């Protein structure tokens, strides 16, 4: 079972990275990990880190959870930035923003790596799926199919071929798929809209009406019936969580209800073990925790707030442990990780990250023993042992130039998935 941060599929786990991709343009890809259920039968677990290289081929590194060692490095395309596993699949897909490709390989077999070509100019920044048969790729750039907007490309996993490319809005940054209806939702930060895509078409279903101001991320509920859209508002006050009934075409493009969030919310994470939704209020230095098992647009509120946790400065990522005891919050402003009780929602301790870490992503393994942080600034992955909340290793990323032996610039970790 793969550990991704939003449910239903893996969007971009580069939780709100600020990355420069070609022509000086900046994009903030959003990803949502899906938390694996606990009690996994595997005896060996791994974390896979995607490493970004603006000047050449990126890579994935494979970290052995039990030994805290880098056991494999695989070369990807230029500007590797996001990764995802299809449902019940051993194949890992990596989006390469710099050369308009997606890499696919089976980590347990150590390759070979297959390169899937997208349309030139696509600049893929996120990918994910709630299916086994298809992978959805979010493209931020203009291509021949969509010369004035972003797009979403569909890869058929059986043939590793692109079957369609459909236009979405401007500067798309996040996507989520309903496992019940199959509808895919794309957040377009450039024009403040959310596009709805029906893979069965394939066709666009239009945009969601009734949205709050400035949508930034999307997450699917455990059963796939609901899509949660985080909106920031004007940035100075509370944001909102807009709830969409994704179970039928009739309600798929309309906000059914909204609940209030903290200041400057950015990302949301679903925890399938406790059936909770966590939202990072980046501007308010807090995390809102909701009961996602009890969604009813007719109620007020439409989804009960269980509690609010005070954390560090500018939280941008959350990973709940699979055993349900704790959740870990990545704080970019204070350069640390806050450990929070999943019962009392009180902060237990803060784990300081290396100086200059510039952390961008956080994940935990299915055994609840390790937490992983992608440190873009120091080009390493920090490993936190959850039994005592201490750092056990800082594993460096590969060099930007293959074979470099002296004064070597390193690639930048961007995203992590575990199993």
Describe each PLM feature range.
Residues 1-11:
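Bacterial N-terminal signal peptides that target proteins for export
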Residues 10-20:
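Bacterial N-terminal signal peptides
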Residues 23-419:
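Predominantly soluble domains enriched in secretory-pathway, periplasmic, or organellar proteins
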